[in-house]
Regions:
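C-terminal charged capping/lid subdomain of soluble metabolic enzymes
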Residues: 2, 311, 321-399
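Glycine/serine-rich anion-binding loops at beta->alpha junctions
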Residues: 95-111, 145-151, 283-286
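Short glycine/serine/threonine-rich phosphate/pyrophosphate-binding segments
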Residues: 24-27, 50-53, 80-83, 105-110, ...
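ATP/NTP phosphate-donor binding region
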Residues: 2-97, 350-351, 378
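Active-site segments that bind and position negatively charged phosphate/pyrophosphate groups
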Residues: 209-339
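A glycine/threonine-rich phosphate-anchoring loop and its flanking beta-alpha core
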Residues: 119-216, 313
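Short Gly/Thr/Asp-enriched flexible loops that form oxyanion-binding sites at enzyme active sites
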Residues: 56-57, 87, 106-120, 153-154
Length: 399
């Protein structure tokens, strides 16, 4: 009997992409064309100030005749407390458009500000804890400075509650930005570590979709495999020279495509590795990309036998593995992926990540308990993992 074909799907990608050099100077006119009058500008650390980017963006807002307010200080693994404070200021300002100038954490915070400003009666954590549903929001624009999360076109956003050390994601079409300005030159100042984290994150957004039990989904598979080959090739260049415009262009565009849904259309998604990583980021404040690279090899080694042929296909098409035996090919593909992460100077186990301090088996069990929402949920679909499976994966990674 024929295997099940691709699943039915709905794909919604309303984000306008403005790609190329000097495009950040169009921010004001773009916001104005979407009806903006009072723009709330969100950014992270001092790099956008030191580089002059923030001045360029605010100048474009002034030239467009728009009123604006800025707020800086977003940190990696965006904090709920900061987002709440930003919402208060945004409401007081009378914001009708939110502009993110930064990477994934800044964009996710901006999405939270947009939801909170449009729903002043609701605490934003209610949306992330799934107690309330987003039914209205403000438009968000993006000036991207970091190729990684893909939040500039995605329907997702994450926040970390520092009080409870819980990191949660929210998926809704209200999260999709109205426009994304993407100038690869804005990534030139990134430290090597952030470039590596970005490459890992981009790969993971596709890998977490690629490893699926869904069969006969040829075009989506080819798109995913092509994206992965492109990122692997250009990531090796960018990690040595982040001023390589061609390499950074390919990586930046791949980051958007990897998380706007296209690399997993028609297939059941897995995303177990992201859930495993979120628990690490929440507890230890490790960079998102690094949290994923520490645990991917352990996850892959634990689950590949649920369908060795899928991992073998990945190994042959992405890594050019010639091994005929599916199990051996699968294992070789996993080794090559982990070795690639290491070549980017990314941690591939907990012991290589200085932020992660799991010293006892009880601590590992506690992490698994948290990741499984205290034993109330499973993660993944390629191989459904319960609390014990999560514990075994963390234990493998804790070497």
């Amino acid at each position: 009997m024929e295997e099940e074909a691709m699943h039915g799907f709905t794909q919604y990608t309303p984000t306008m992409i403005i790609f190329g050099k000097e495009t950040q100077k169009q921010a004001g006119e773009l916001a104005k064309s979407l009806g903006a009058t009072k723009v709330f500008v969100v950014y992270g650390g001092g790099s956008v100030v030191r580089s002059g980017l923030l001045d360029q963006v605010t100048a474009s807002l002034q030239e467009a005749g728009l009123d604006y307010m800025t707020i800086g200080g977003v940190k990696p693994n965006p904090r709920l407390s900061f987002a709440r404070e930003a919402v208060k200021k945004s409401i007081e300002f009378g914001t009708d458009f939110v502009l993110a100038v930064g990477g994934g954490s800044v964009i996710d915070t901006s999405k939270a500000v947009a939801h909170g400003t449009a729903n002043p009666e609701t605490d934003i954590w209610e949306f992330w804890s799934k107690k309330q549903t987003v039914t209205k929001s403000l438009p968000v624009g993006v000036v991207l400075t970091l190729a990684a999360a893909g939040s500039e076109t995605s329907d997702s956003a994450v926040l970390t509650n520092e009080d409870t050390k819980i990191k949660r994601g929210l998926s809704t079409d209200f999260n999709r930005p109205a426009f994304a300005i993407m100038n690869p030159e804005l990534t030139y100042t990134l430290p090597k570590y952030q470039v590596g984290c970005g490459v890992v994150d981009i790969m993971m957004h596709t890998l977490d979709r690629y490893f699926t039990q869904t069969e006969n989904n040829e075009l989506t598979d080819e798109i995913a495999e092509g994206l992965l080959r492109t990122v692997i090739r250009n990531g090796a260049v960018a990690i040595k020279d982040s001023h390589d415009y061609n390499a950074m262009s390919e990586i930046m565009w791949a980051g958007s495509l990897s998380h706007n849904g296209i690399t997993g259309l028609g297939a059941e998604k897995d995303f177990a590795v992201h859930q495993l990583g979120h628990e690490l980021s929440a507890k230890f404040d490790i960079a998102h990309g690094a949290s994923l690279s520490t645990v991917w090899g352990a996850w892959a080694a634990y689950v590949y036998d649920a369908k060795p042929a899928r991992f073998a296909q990945y190994a042959r098409r992405v890594w050019n593995v010639e091994e005929a035996d599916d199990v051996k090919a699968a294992q070789e593909g996993i080794k090559k992926t982990v070795a690639y992460f290491a070549s980017l100077d990314m941690p591939t186990s907990f012991s290589e990540a200085t932020e992660i301090g799991l010293k006892t088996d009880e601590e590992v069990k506690k992490m698994a308990h948290g990741c499984s929402y205290e034993g109330t949920r499973t993660i993944g679909s390629f191989k459904v993992c319960d609390e014990n499976d999560i514990y075994e994966i963390y234990k493998l990674a804790n070497k």
